[in-house]
Amino acid sequence: MGFTDLAAPLLLVALMLGYLLGSIPFGLLLTKAAGLGDIRDIGSGNIGATNALRTGNRWVAIGTLIGDAGKGAVAVLLSGLLAAHTSADQTWMLSLAALGAFLGHLYPVWLGFKGGKGISTLIGILLALYWPVGLLFCATWAIVALVSRYSSLSALVATLLMPVYLAWLDRWELVGLSVLLAALVYIAHRGNIGRLLSGTEPRIGQKKAEDTAEG
């Protein structure tokens, strides 16, 4: 697989399609639709599902989670369909769509490039790319959350193991993408990492206005 064999315009389409889908701010749209105001003025100000839960409306939070995960999955699935009917390499199409969706959520053009932290979108991407790893990611998050009561630590551990799971299941063509996505997750969570190291990161259920590991 090399760049000389690829249909460059189609790869750009996959990247841009992913970005546009990923940049849809479901948390913001749903909180406003529910009459709860601007999610950026609530809690941590993050547009993800965790902060949506701070509105007190669990259905808005669930909708945000589904929407954020769904846009990542849809971006990957649509690019896969496009690749199946064109000469573009499928792995590159899927990878660029996934990367675009993730970047769109983290840096949405509509919100001044200030978005969420990407965990919900990452879950959707993984489930669409290779669902066993998506399930392993979710299971890892749940186990670490149950033991530690830290949402951010759960996200960081699951993300760190993501490339390991892909390699273990012999999906080497996706390992490079997963390493890049993991790096972006850690950059987005740098504030959480600092608070974990200093012992000031809030545990699940604790009230705090600062950002935690959110979608």
Question: At which residue positions do the language-model features occur?
Answer:
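Short, non-helical or kinked segments that cap or interrupt transmembrane helices
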Residues: 37-49, 110-123, 150-156
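Alpha-helical transmembrane segments in multi-pass membrane proteins
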Residues: 10, 14, 18-19, 23, ...
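C-terminal ends of transmembrane helices
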Residues: 27-32, 50-51, 104-114, 141-148, ...
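Cytosolic, membrane-interface loops and tails of multi-pass inner-membrane proteins
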Residues: 28-60, 192-215
